Every structure is written in structure tokens, then in C-alpha cells.
Curated annotation (Swiss-Prot):
Belongs to the universal ribosomal protein uS14 family. It comes from the Bacteria. The keyword RNA-binding applies. It comes from Corynebacterium jeikeium (strain K411). Pfam families: Ribosomal_S14. Binds 16S rRNA, required for the assembly of 30S particles and may also be responsible for determining the conformation of the 16S rRNA at the A site. Gene3D superfamilies: 1.10.287.1480. This is Small ribosomal subunit protein uS14. Part of the 30S ribosomal subunit. Contacts proteins S3 and S10. One of its GO terms (biological process) is translation. GO terms for molecular function: rRNA binding; structural constituent of ribosome. PANTHER family: 30S RIBOSOMAL PROTEIN S14 (PTHR19836), SMALL RIBOSOMAL SUBUNIT PROTEIN US14A (PTHR19836:SF23). InterPro entries: Ribosomal_uS14, Ribosomal_uS14_bac/plastid. Keywords: Ribonucleoprotein, Ribosomal protein, RNA-binding, rRNA-binding.
């Protein structure tokens, strides 16, 4: 099980990302637009750099929904590989079977 403080910090990052997402998208659009002037582009870059680091979606870590394990995360299930394996063996995941060939 992950430390509760790390899980809480990750949740806080998700909120910050959501809060700044729209403005970040606008600034990135200005920066990437070939029709914007150099000054507009520079101002947009400057404002983007002034935003908090945690506003970047890259800083959010995918974690197991059950216990917060940060590694071995499977997006399809929202769980770690260890938990998926245990749940599959117990038959708690519909449509998931142990492979055999």
C-alpha cells in the first residue's frame, strides 16, 4: 500500500491540473500558432512558465484505485497488475480468463 500522503498529493495534483487545463490549452495554442507574432508567443510562453509545476498533466501519476500502488498500473482496469491477477484468479473480473495455448 502506498503512503497516504503520496496518494493525497497525487489527488491534489489532479485538482490543480483540472483548474489550469483550459488556460494551458489556450497558451499552447498561441505558442503553436504560426500566425501569432513573436511577442505574443513569448508572452504566452512566459505566462505558461509562471504557472505552478503541478499544473502540468505530466506530473500526475496513475495509481491503483484500490491501494494507490504507483507501479504496474493497467489502464484498462485502473488497477495494478498484482491486484488484477488476484481478482482474475478469484473470478471477480468479468470476461477475464487465464490464458492457455
Amino acid at each position: 500500500m502506498a503512503k497516504k500522503s503520496m496518494i493525497a498529493k497525487n489527488e491534489q495534483r489532479k485538482e490543480i491540473v483540472a483548474r489550469y487545463a483550459e488556460r494551458r490549452a489556450e497558451l499552447k495554442k498561441i505558442i503553436k500558432n504560426p500566425n501569432s507574432t513573436d511577442e505574443e508567443r513569448l508572452d504566452a510562453q512566459w505566462e505558461l512558465n509562471r504557472q505552478p509545476r503541478d499544473a502540468s498533466p505530466v506530473r500526475v501519476r496513475n495509481r491503483d484505485a484500490a491501494d494507490g500502488r504507483p507501479r504496474g498500473y493497467l489502464r484498462k482496469f485502473g488497477l495494478s497488475r498484482v491486484r488484477v491477477r488476484n481478482m482474475a484468479h478469484r473470478g471477480e473480473l468479468p470476461g477475464v480468463r487465464k490464458s492457455s495455448w
